[in-house]
């Protein structure tokens, strides 16, 4: 949070009383290493360095000392945030949490269906306290438009989320729900394509999937989408971290993001592209969900095992509930809890 404030250097000096240095953001590499070395040479008493829009570097003669220094500095920052943050970091709440299960099921199916036209995707839903505080706030759209907090997150979450109308508004227009969602997705897709065209240079990797990863809905929560469940969940966790950073920065000062150009340079960095190319190909049923009846029996169990081994998420059912629970635990141990329900 301190690293993303518009007066971050000033706040760092105030919190650490000269014991922590500051460097403006730049991509990791040899030049950044030289700047850090130069800063340490000129300030031999500092315990760490904050890199703007990124985070904290600490060191020590031993790994234990380095860890201890890191914990000490983080606790000092947390104490400052806790004592200084205002009540409504994102502005006063203008929405309240709302629940309407039948419509929510339709909404989830509609959004996932529209996002899966070209490539099947899996949804992760988050209704945590920080998510509801953010999506129900007065300044949701303004803060969301600044972009996510940490450059490391861009590949997971994209720079910007998509913000939909409130759940009440969507319910009121239930008969036009497909049109509303499709229009918002098209708007996001076109804006992302323009962002790519504005910032690409010779040798830039090709345009990636232009659709949103993170979708925010006032009164409801956050949806994240990816080609598999674990990636969707991690993307959600990353954006929860981003919202906490935004809350800290907005609650004391003003949250700032990287420039659009620099954000693009990170998102489409050759090193990041190399990471993507090294990832194993998706399995045949990645992005799919299967409902399996009689899953505790021989045929159902074998079917579930085959689907899971091909990357599918499965929902297991059986009239023998005790046998079903045992089989479910067996599959969770083998394939992970993200894909077994």
PLM segments and residue spans:
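Hydrophobic anchor at the start of a short beta-strand
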Residues: 214, 314, 321, 339-341
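Conserved glycine-rich Rossmann-like NAD(P)H-binding loop of the short-chain dehydrogenase/reductase
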Residues: 310-327
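Generic hydrophobic, amphipathic alpha-helix propensity
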Residues: 299, 324-327, 331
